[in-house]
Amino acid sequence: MEMNLQFFSHHKGGGSTSNGRDSAGRRLGTKRADGQAAKAGMIIYRQRGTHIYPGVNVGRGNDDTLFALADGVVRFERKGRDKRQVSVYPVADAE
């Protein structure tokens, strides 16, 4: 009489998962707040797409970053009913 014994693992296999990764945050968002002074060239808002549109004295980079074109004070405003824009208004020199 011949016996055929098979021993099975008492621990399940390790398996695999498709999780376990994450990327660093992209540091998007407001860099200059409403009412803050900004010099020409300063970044005001970093974004992907146009959450906020450029207004007076504000330019838009090819990565949609908004930056000041002139020295002044930053103002976040409404553009129509459902859009927002940011402008930089020059301040008169007090002498």
Swiss-Prot record:
Pfam families from the UniProt entry: Ribosomal_L27 (PF01016)
A Gene Ontology biological process term: translation
InterPro entries in the record: Ribosomal_bL27, Ribosomal_bL27_CS
GO cellular component: cytosolic large ribosomal subunit
GO molecular function terms attached to this record: structural constituent of ribosome
UniProt propeptide residues: 1-8
PTM comment, free text: The N-terminus is cleaved by ribosomal processing cysteine protease Prp.
SUPFAM superfamilies according to UniProt: Ribosomal L27 protein-like
Keyword list, A-Z: Ribonucleoprotein, Ribosomal protein
Residues covered by region (Disordered): 1-34
UniProt KW Cell cycle keyword: no
Family according to the record: Belongs to the bacterial ribosomal protein bL27 family.
Protein name per Swiss-Prot or TrEMBL: Large ribosomal subunit protein bL27
Source organism (scientific name): Pediococcus pentosaceus (strain ATCC 25745 / CCUG 21536 / LMG 10740 / 183-1w)
Lineage: Bacteria, Bacillati, Bacillota, Bacilli, Lactobacillales
